[in-house]
Amino acid sequence: MAELPVAPFERILKKAGAERVSRAAAEYLAEAVEEIALEIAKEAVELAKHAKRKTVKVEDIKLALKK
């Protein structure tokens, strides 16, 4: 189960045009987004380490998103 709250994903699905959203669908979307975010975060951490920094900066996230 995802660590992120499910309610925001229900709102995202409704904003995308869904009239009704099952809890399972919102949970699945939350899990998928969490997996993708974790991969981006891992890449950003590696970029920060490569730059000899302990702090992940917005540039690291932007570069990680491009990969």
UniProtKB/Swiss-Prot annotation:
Interaction with DNA: annotated segments: 20-22, 54-57
Gene Ontology molecular function: any one: protein heterodimerization activity
SUPFAM superfamilies recorded: Histone-fold
Keywords carried by this UniProt record: Chromosome, Cytoplasm, DNA-binding
Site positions per UniProt: Interaction with DNA: 14
UniProt GO cellular component terms: chromosome; cytoplasm
SMART domains: TAF
Subcellular localization, as worded in the UniProt entry: Cytoplasm; Chromosome
One Pfam family in the UniProt entry: CBFD_NFYB_HMF
Coiled coil segments of this chain: none
Gene3D superfamilies: Histone, subunit A
Subunit structure comment from the entry: Homodimer or heterodimer with another histone. Dimers then assemble into higher oligomers, with the DNA wrapped around the protein core.
Protein family according to the UniProt entry: Belongs to the archaeal histone HMF family.
Function noted in UniProt: Binds and compact DNA (95 to 150 base pairs) to form nucleosome-like structures that contain positive DNA supercoils. Increases the resistance of DNA to thermal denaturation (in vitro).
Record's protein name: Probable archaeal histone 1
Source organism of the structure: Methanocaldococcus jannaschii (strain ATCC 43067 / DSM 2661 / JAL-1 / JCM 10045 / NBRC 100440)
Record lineage: Archaea, Methanobacteriati, Methanobacteriota, Methanomada group, Methanococci
